[in-house]
Curated annotation (Swiss-Prot):
Name of the protein: A-type ATP synthase subunit C
Membrane topology: Peripheral membrane protein
Protein family membership: Belongs to the V-ATPase V0D/AC39 subunit family.
Role according to the record: Component of the A-type ATP synthase that produces ATP from ADP in the presence of a proton gradient across the membrane.
GO molecular function: ATP binding; proton-transporting ATP synthase activity, rotational mechanism; proton-transporting ATPase activity, rotational mechanism
GO biological-process terms attached to the record: proton motive force-driven plasma membrane ATP synthesis
Amino acid sequence: MEAVTGILNTTIAVVFTWVGYKTARIIWKYTPYSYPNARIKAMEAKLLTEQKFNELAESRTLQNFVVNLEDTDYKDYLADVSSYTVEEVEKALERALAGTYELMFKILPKRSKGFFELLLEGWDVRNIANVVKAKLANEPASDYVVELGTMLPKVKAMAEAKTLEEILVILEGTPYEEVYQKLLLGEIDVTRFETELYRMHYGKLLSYALSRKDDERIILEEFVRLSIDRVNILTALRAKKAGLSAEEIKPMLIPGGTVKLDPLLHVDSFDMALAELDSTKYGQVIRDVREEIEKDLSVLEKALNDHIIERISELERFYPLSIATPLSYVLRREREIRKLRAIAKLIENGVEPERIKELAGEVA
């Protein structure tokens, strides 16, 4: 009897230990997202509606544009706008996006912050590439700096640099030093330089995603691979339109995507390249905008961006207490700010409101 009781007690102890472990694991996985995701959901409700965008398109002046945003979350960022130039408005909108990232770092669980830091590094890559290209083209580099990223002071110093060699000193000790040195030595051209920057960036994103577990890995890996596919598809199609060969295009592509682009690279025309994509998982996305793509590839860029957001939103519904919610919000916020920037530029250029509404809807 005592042996039976002992076995029973041991079994109960094992069961309770297992239940305790599973409960603790569930709490560890999901509870940290309860507060931030609830807060983000409240913020999502404040994203601008189509009606609001139409109202902004009717502004006619940038001063009215700013006034029409006073009842939104952009009010504080636009408070210092005084000369009402498009550059001033754009800088304010960039600060708003930076504020979104800062909030994510503040409210998200510690284990999630690393991915958003890597996303922010993507703005470093964009800034570095733009500054270097501007310098090589003898254009004012500061005009191409976005007020966002983890190394903004260095980027601004690069923009002010008098020589290309001075930029190398500024980049010393960063992950970008070696590839920039290759550019200076003439070992690679500026196109390959930019490709290498983005290869490093997406490589880091993918490595991070693959290092995660469970739903976090599913969500982040899906996002990164979709993002790589988007870049590669657009790069390949632009190159095909420019008449480049498969051998010229291959070094421009980023590893880690899901779409096999080799058949596309070896076809003879842009139309045939689009036809090759028809049998991929992006076939429907492309078919929906096929006619417009032939005139303007930015239409496909917008469609692919929207597809990524929709996919992350689907994952958010499946994993409501996860990193999908903040990721979805940041992507929507970035899209919103791109649209606001486009409207501001069109207003400054004197475009009629109805045309602004039409063009703003096409912004990626």
